[in-house]
Amino acid sequence: MAQFFKAKPNTSKQLSSKLSLKVTQLDHLGAGIAHHDGKIVFINGALPGETVSVQLTEQKKKFARAKLLKIDKASAQRVSPLCPHFDKCGGCDLQHLDIDAQRKHKASTLVDLVNKFAQTQAGEVCDTLSDNAWHYRRRARLATWFDKNTKHISLGFRASSSSDVVEIQSCAVLAEPLSALIPDLAFMLNQLSGKKALGHVELTQADNGNFVVLRVTKALSDKDKARLVEFANKHQVIVLLQDDDAQCEHLNGAGEQPYYGFDDNQVKLNFSPGNFIQVNAQVNQAMVSQAVEWLSPKADERVLDLFCGIGNFSLPLAKDGAEVIGVEGVQAMVEQARINAKQSGLDKVSFYHADLSADLSKEPWLGKVDKMLIDPARAGAYESMQSLKKLKPKALVYVSCNPASLARDSEVILKQGYQLKKIGLVDMFPQTHHLESMALFELKN
């Protein structure tokens, strides 16, 4: 069972004590939990069942933190991290735990959170939606850091709890074609005369090819652009430059926009560098299919999709004839969603830009809502759920990337006359403590 604690502000005391502790469980962020002097001790990198030597680094009234020094007795679920950058990079924090144990822990965390904070039983716990444990990310944003002394630009990810950039040669969770680009890309960027103007680098694997987006703070020279085009042609990628106003310049590819599709591209979603997409293509397909199955929208029903983005759920929900209303807080994604619907030949889908923290029941375009789907950011949809009683959808699917927000919002939903019928883990981010989930609520009676 996962444990959850809310730390209250208190003055920290730095300690140097070295202790031998027995780890009993993991917390919801993947840290090992032990006990000492009546306090909970959090130990990053430690696993349940292990005996470890640690050094206390922080102590507060009810808990302490410790640095892992040595594993005296290892868990049978401990594995060697695949990534050579694991001990420095802040991207993956559970590579040392067997993948089956990772998923079991996440599922337990999800159910425990909902049971505890929503004060309800989780209903039917569905099978975990999962796919490959490695090389699953179709998109990643790499950081850059320019060393003024050496004139070298580093390309990599941020270190854990730090702004430092860990220079990498590969990434074990990034799609293999994208991971393979990193060494040559880093070398090429260091050849640019304008490398000091480079910001982050976004790598994307779309259904129509691989894309490299370079954020630049000022224009690059024609010579630098020629080097980038040479790199693009050699590696068969499309390279774009993105300025501070998020405007993109294609250096090759004739303005081609990345896309991904469903159902053999009968439904196709184009997206831009600034648009949000789910990074795990295979799990996203399974998640969308499950959402459509759970809601089973009929041709005479109206479905409301809040936080709809570019139409990831809206378009598949409309495929069998239901009328779908997608609402999004970012105007650019609303415009892209409308284009995607038109290109997919779906004329019963409409998209609107709105403040999702406001009461949408008064919007003239809303009307009757038979069923509903929400897919909010980590902050959840607490404000949006306040008007649920006015809309009264028969069924609601909540897609969550933060189990704490889901648990909090579930309490609001239940108080408005709904019951939790199904819940399930969506393992969108293997090798990390992050978890996606889905819950189905149905109106009572």
UniProtKB/Swiss-Prot annotation:
User: Which GO molecular function annotations are given, in alphabetical order?
Assistant: 4 iron, 4 sulfur cluster binding; iron ion binding; RNA binding; rRNA (uridine-C5-)-methyltransferase activity
**Keyword Phosphoprotein recorded:** no
Q: Which UniProt keywords apply?
A: 4Fe-4S, Iron, Iron-sulfur, Metal-binding, Methyltransferase, rRNA processing, S-adenosyl-L-methionine, Transferase
What the record says about family reads: Belongs to the class I-like SAM-binding methyltransferase superfamily. RNA M5U methyltransferase family. RlmD subfamily.
Protein name from the UniProt record: 23S rRNA (uracil(1939)-C(5))-methyltransferase RlmD
Q: What does this protein do?
A: Catalyzes the formation of 5-methyl-uridine at position 1939 (m5U1939) in 23S rRNA.
- InterPro entries to which the protein is assigned, alphabetical: 23S_rRNA_MeTrfase_RlmD, MeTrfase_TrmA_AS, MeTrfase_TrmA_CS, NA-bd_OB-fold, SAM-dependent_MTases_sf, TRAM_dom, U5_MeTrfase_fam
Q: Which reaction does it catalyse?
A: uridine(1939) in 23S rRNA + S-adenosyl-L-methionine = 5-methyluridine(1939) in 23S rRNA + S-adenosyl-L-homocysteine + H(+)
Catalytic residue list: 401 (nucleophile)
- Tell me where on the tree of life, at the top rank, the source sits: Bacteria
